[in-house]
Design a protein with these regions (language model features):
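Short, Lys/Arg- and Gly-enriched loop/turn segments at beta-strand edges
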Residues: 100-104
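Short, basic/aromatic beta-hairpin or loop at an interaction surface
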Residues: 62-70
Length: 116
């Protein structure tokens, strides 16, 4: 495993990129900013390595971009209708960030945090 600098965050901290490679050449790159999968290189049918993941070139892209690209950590997956739910008689309200629904997570939560 290699660890390289992946850029600086707006608050001045440095984000790292961890590159893991298998014995057969498959390569994954994950940043400690949101545990986002930055790239995944696998061989195509002719053995040529291809990156099959949409990712940004540096930490700044993940910090300022949209769409949860590469995000692997979040409070919940998919959409919570009505931006809220009830559990054991207790009503929990979430941020409506997709019309009247809450999509994937609220603003400034797990998927957008540095794991440094």
């Amino acid at each position: 495993m290699k660890n390289i600098k992946f850029g600086s965050l707006e608050d001045g901290r440095t984000a790292g990129l961890y590159i893991l490679e298998s014995a057969v050449g498959m390569r994954a790159a994950v940043t400690d900013y949101g545990a986002a999968l930055v790239s995944l290189a696998v061989p195509d049918s002719k053995g040529v390595m291809r990156d099959v993941v949409l990712g940004y070139d540096d930490a700044h892209g993940y910090e300022t971009g949209s769409g949860f690209i590469g995000a692997s950590v979040g409070r919940f997956a998919n959409r919570i209708a009505g931006a809220g739910f009830e559990l054991n008689g207790q009503r929990y309200s979430l941020t409506a960030n997709d019309g009247t629904n809450c999509l994937r997570s609220e603003e400034h939560t797990s998927e957008l945090q540095s794991r440094i």
